[in-house]
Amino acid sequence: MRALVGDVERPFALASVSKLLTAYAALVATEEQTLALDEAAGPPGATVAHLLAHASGLGPTGELLAAPGTRRIYSNAGFETLAAHLAARSGIAFADYLAEAVLSPLAMGATRLVGSPAYGAEAPLGDLVAFAGELLSPRLLATETLALATSVAFPGLSGVLPGFGRQEHCDWGLGPELRDHKSPHWTGGANAPSSFGHFGQSGTFLLVDPVAALSVVLLTDRPFGEWAVGGWPALLDAVLADPVLAPPGR
């Protein structure tokens, strides 16, 4: 079942939800053999996989804070480095590659990358729902590739989840953030540990719960804050408790 509330055509700034789109383009590139997850990219010793999983050691603005694979350091600069690397390897501007590899095939015609590949996309609800559907049942990627991308990359790394503090096991996939057993967290207490997605500082999120076989997309123009810290988990638990939106036994 699909339930849409609000203006589905109005574009919203996605903020860091943009990283899911950037990561998906990079994953498509690996299947096209334009990139390899284990190829060198970013600081010495780092790979494409390190950049996707916030494990390259790069800090938020590009400073090297740790050796690759030793800490989970959330880094916009890492995703910008990844996009630049993909552009160099493909010979195509990253925004064009994203459009050709992801947006056009999913009929996301109103989505635009207007700034950083880490946080600069804009999209309406209808387009993000199409992308969420792809994450539930992939057509652009092999099932095995998406399964790898939504499994823990570089397990055991601690780090800070923006807005929610330090996590002893700050698990991340190859782009998506993984719910696992993080606490506190922006997902609902009833969401499966295998749930994955991303939220953005513009008050946006995209979450996929594979156990419930559902996805939830929220787009707002209210900056992330305490309203989201308390409200999003309650909202997601309410969705899971709704027998129409999340039928028992799915």
For the regions a protein language model found, what residue spans apply to each?
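Short, hydrophobic secondary-structure boundary micro-motifs
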Residues: 37-39, 60-64, 111-114, 143-144, ...
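Secretory-pathway/luminal and periplasmic proteins that interact with or process carbohydrate-rich
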Residues: 57-61, 106-113, 154-161
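Active-site-proximal loop and beta-strand segments within enzyme catalytic domains
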Residues: 2, 6-96
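Sec-exported extracytoplasmic/periplasmic mature domains
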Residues: 30-31, 53-57, 103, 107, ...
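Catalytic loop of the DD-peptidase/beta-lactamase superfamily, centered on the K-T-G motif
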Residues: 1-13, 18, 70-71, 87-92, ...
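Short acidic/histidine-centered micro-motifs embedded in hydrophobic/aromatic stretches
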Residues: 44, 54, 100-105, 148-152
